């Protein structure tokens, strides 16, 4: 039985239990009975919000979109999420295409009339706190309870997705996906443990700017690194100056700084696109003479990783599969 099939077997029972008991989340949220619907108080980025225990009509935006699609939440509307389409399974992509779009890619592109027409009993906003300023929160709150649960640092997607799933009444589904991911990560850690022992890794991400002559250096806890870390990879170093959020774990040095930035690396991973090819910003690094002279490159310890922007446990399984495929040559050494 697949993780998704398992979810469907237990989802109805879990929701029924939640309504009967009016239980709070594992975060200690309180619960109460209001009219015919059980409610609880949920701690969100925008404060303590009273929400249904078992939401029946959910609108999701931003990072909450893939999370709640995977969790089989009772979605009636979502924002556009084109950046994550390549990470979706065929089943999730079909769900994404079927659902009404009530907002664009940016928070400012919220269609309030479309949100109201969806008649939600819960709205889950999955955008960073600074982006909330682009949303008319009072207008949304006049439609349904609104919980803002947005990203902070790249590796925080684990807790972010847990909270979003919890708000939508799908905590059990989330747990099943989490356990499947952790099992796979443990398998890879065991499989490659000996080969990875003692190796210091660096990572090149895909957001360098060719026009400015910079490359994207990612450290532990960044998009390109955090999932590989769960498989046993150790990334060394840190940013010169923390800038908050993702800038705490990533920086953009000039390409001339490649020897300084990655010269101590025993091995290097780099982000590739879903089709396995590097984006232009990565290709400019790989084509550089400075890159070719790095010790890790000369030693043949460079590995392209797909799906490094995964922000859900289900999609991160694809990242782990890519890690497994990329590291296979290490076992032949």
Task: Describe the residue ranges of each PLM region.
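Short helix-initiation/N-cap motifs at beta->coil->alpha
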Residues: 44-46, 102-112, 243-255
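A short, structured surface patch at a secondary-structure boundary
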Residues: 61-114, 118, 122, 126-129
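Charged, glycine-enriched surface loops/patches
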Residues: 135-172, 279-301
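Bacterial Sec-exported substrate-binding components of ABC uptake systems
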Residues: 2-66, 172-207, 272-281, 298, ...
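Structured C-terminal subdomain patch of bacterial secreted/periplasmic proteins
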Residues: 261-333
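Ligand-binding pocket segment of bilobal, Venus flytrap-like solute-binding proteins
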Residues: 195, 225, 245-275
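Proline-aspartate-enriched helix->loop->beta-strand connector
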Residues: 116-125, 145, 258, 263-268
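Alpha-helical, coiled-coil/dimerization segments enriched in small aliphatic residues
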Residues: 215-251
């Amino acid at each position: 039985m697949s993780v998704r099939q398992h979810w469907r077997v237990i989802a109805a029972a879990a929701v029924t239990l939640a309504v009967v008991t009016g239980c709070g989340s594992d975060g200690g949220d309180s619960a109460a009975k209001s009219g015919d619907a059980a409610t609880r108080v949920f701690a969100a980025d925008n404060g303590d919000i009273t929400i249904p225990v078992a939401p029946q009509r959910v609108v999701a935006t931003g990072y909450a979109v893939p999370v709640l699609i995977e969790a089989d939440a009772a979605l009636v509307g979502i924002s556009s999420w084109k950046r994550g389409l390549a990470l979706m399974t065929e089943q999730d992509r079909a769900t994404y295409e079927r659902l009404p779009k009530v907002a664009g890619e940016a928070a400012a592109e919220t269609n309030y009339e479309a949100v109201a027409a969806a008649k939600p009993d819960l709205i889950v906003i999955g955008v960073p706190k600074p982006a909330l300023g682009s949303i008319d929160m009072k207008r949304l709150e006049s439609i349904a309870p609104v919980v803002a649960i947005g990203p902070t640092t790249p590796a925080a997607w684990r807790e972010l997705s847990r909270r979003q799933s919890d708000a939508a009444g799908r905590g059990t589904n989330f747990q099943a996906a989490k356990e499947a991911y952790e099992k796979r990560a443990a398998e890879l850690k065991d499989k490659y443990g000996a080969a990875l022992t003692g190796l210091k890794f660096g990572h090149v991400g895909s957001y360098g700017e060719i026009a400015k002559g910079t490359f994207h250096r990612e450290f532990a806890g960044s998009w390109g690194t955090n999932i590989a870390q769960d498989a046993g990879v150790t990334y060394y170093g840190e940013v010169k100056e923390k800038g908050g959020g993702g800038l705490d774990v990533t920086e953009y040095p000039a390409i001339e700084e490649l020897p300084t930035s990655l010269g101590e690396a025993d091995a290097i991973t780099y982000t590739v696109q879903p089709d396995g090819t590097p984006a232009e910003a990565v290709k400019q690094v790989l084509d550089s003479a400075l890159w070719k002279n790095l010790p890790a490159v000369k030693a043949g310890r460079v590995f392209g990783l797909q799906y490094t922007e995964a922000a859900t446990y289900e999609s991160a399984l694809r990242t782990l599969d890519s890690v497994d495929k990329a590291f296979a040559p290490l076992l032949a050494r």
